[in-house]
Amino acid sequence: MFSGLTLNCVLLLLQLLLARSLENAYVFEVGKNAYLPCSYTLSTPGALVPMCWGKGFCPWSQCTNELLRTDERNVTYQKSSRYQLKGDLNKGDVSLIIKNVTLDDHGTYCCRIQFPGLMNDKKLELKLDIKAAKVTPAQTAHGDSTTASPRTLTTERNGSETQTLVTLHNNNGTKISTWADEIKDSGETIRTAIHIGVGVSAGLTLALIIGVLILKWYSCKKKKLSSLSLITLANLPPGGLANAGAVRIRSEENIYTIEENVYEVENSNEYYCYVNSQQPS
């Protein structure tokens, strides 16, 4: 008996943990109407059951982010006219139609059939994927048809942004360039400009630093020479300046005396020669 009770507890726990059914993925193009099937079997004819549709995983009760709700026979809540039930409610068909889908409609949807009793609800989770619309073939001037295959390109610039990239091919297999090449070229140009700007800024900064260091070194050297001159003058004896001036004056007088002596010697020689010339032969 104890083992049977344990087995029942384990089964109940598994039911609680694995109550969600496997997700079924449905893919639709942008602008189309999406169809998400959901139905249940009536226990007896006319025994309809309330249900709800929500966006997100099925919670423990009701529907998260409720989109549509019914009682036994009628729709009692509808978030938008885009969400409609097109099946036969009297036969248990509660499939959801989403009109004119966009990329924001992708995600998981919950269909909850609220059968009477505890833990008796039927929960069905369906995954909706939205892809970009295909571009129709265009006829060229020479009669060659051109096909386009769209791809989704995600870029991050002040947030997440999704764009459609179209690559064109003609019958000859020639690829027609699209704006993807322009984006690539512009990106390389921007990176090159950034690198050049960083290099120029670094060079100017280095030159400025070197100039400041040179000016600082020159200023320090000039101050050092001025300090040495002041120290030399301060170490001279009290009469040193006067003695230096006197020595300079005496040197100038000696120069004048030497010049006068030379002049007198030249005059005496001339006189001697003149006297000798007066003697008889």
UniProtKB/Swiss-Prot annotation:
Residues 139-160 are annotated as: Disordered. Keywords: Adaptive immunity, Cell junction, Disulfide bond, Glycoprotein, Immunity, Immunoglobulin domain, Inflammatory response, Innate immunity, Membrane, Metal-binding, Phosphoprotein, Secreted, Signal, Transmembrane, Transmembrane helix. One of its GO terms (biological process) is macrophage activation involved in immune response. Residues 20-125 form the Ig-like V-type domain. The modification Phosphotyrosine is found at Y256. The Ig-like V-type (immunoglobulin-like) domain mediates binding to PtSer involving a Ca(2+) ion. Cell surface receptor implicated in modulating innate and adaptive immune responses. Generally accepted to have an inhibiting function. Reports on stimulating functions suggest that the activity may be influenced by the cellular context and/or the respective ligand. Regulates macrophage activation. Inhibits T-helper type 1 lymphocyte (Th1)-mediated auto- and alloimmune responses and promotes immunological tolerance. In CD8+ cells attenuates TCR-induced signaling, specifically by blocking NF-kappaB and NFAT promoter activities resulting in the loss of IL-2 secretion. Belongs to the T-cell and airway phenotype regulator (Tapr) locus, a single chromosomal region that confers reduced T-helper type 2 responsiveness and protects against airway hyperactivity (AHR), the hallmark of human asthma. In vivo administration of antibody to HAVCR2 enhances the clinical and pathological severity of experimental autoimmune encephalomyelitis (EAE), a Th1-dependent autoimmune disease and increases the number and activation level of macrophages. This is Hepatitis A virus cellular receptor 2 homolog.
